[in-house]
């Protein structure tokens, strides 16, 4: 039960994040993103918590719509997909000591690391043209964690769309 609750908390994704939060964005530098005006969703790896999935979907749709890219299932330019995951990580400290009178205690600490990957896939070519990855240590209660999701997504899309490609 503890693991299930912890996993749900971690998948409340990047919730109350520590300073260890990292956002990485990659894109095809040959692509002109100004032509993308519509998208539809394709299935990815959903969070365990349905409410988290709804928050993620709304946050991503909001970031795209403020940039002039709107949902259109009939004729999308882009497919949007996200992958949410969490894993427990361990940190081991201590160990051998030079003083043989002391056993050299070992301390093991664990924390949850959450990852969110958002891919934008060119619908015509069926290939990823933009990817943002956010990773962070997740802590705090579920309500606070859920409340932080939109700001994490906003940071992921901060520089979207990328600048138009230069001359060859």
Residue spans of the language-model regions?
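Solvent-exposed, acidic/flexible segments
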Residues: 34, 49-57, 109-114, 138, ...
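A structural "domain/chain start" motif
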Residues: 17-67, 75-76, 82, 165-168
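C-terminal partner/receptor-binding element of secreted or periplasmic proteins
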Residues: 136-168
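Residues at beta-strand starts and edge strands
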Residues: 4-5, 37, 76, 114
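Bacterial N-terminal signal peptides
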Residues: 4-15
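Residue-level detector of anion-binding/catalytic polar loops
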Residues: 70
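Surface-exposed short loop/turn segments
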Residues: 23, 67, 76-129, 135, ...
């Amino acid at each position: 039960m503890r693991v299930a609750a912890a996993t749900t908390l971690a998948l409340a994704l990047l919730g109350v994040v520590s300073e260890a939060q990292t956002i990485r964005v990659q894109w095809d530098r040959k692509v002109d993103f100004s032509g993308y005006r519509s998208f539809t969703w394709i299935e990815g790896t959903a969070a365990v918590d349905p409410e988290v999935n709804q928050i993620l979907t709304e946050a991503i749709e909001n970031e795209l719509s403020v940039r002039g890219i709107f949902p259109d299932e009939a004729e999308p330019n882009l497919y949007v997909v996200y992958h949410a995951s969490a894993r427990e990580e361990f940190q081991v400290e201590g160990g051998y000591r030079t003083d043989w009178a002391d056993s050299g205690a070992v301390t093991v600490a664990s924390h949850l690391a959450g990852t969110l990957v958002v891919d934008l896939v060119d619908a015509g070519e069926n290939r990823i043209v933009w990817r943002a990855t956010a990773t962070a240590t997740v802590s705090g209660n579920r309500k606070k964690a859920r409340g932080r999701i939109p700001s994490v997504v906003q940071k992921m899309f901060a520089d979207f769309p990328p600048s138009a490609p230069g001359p060859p």
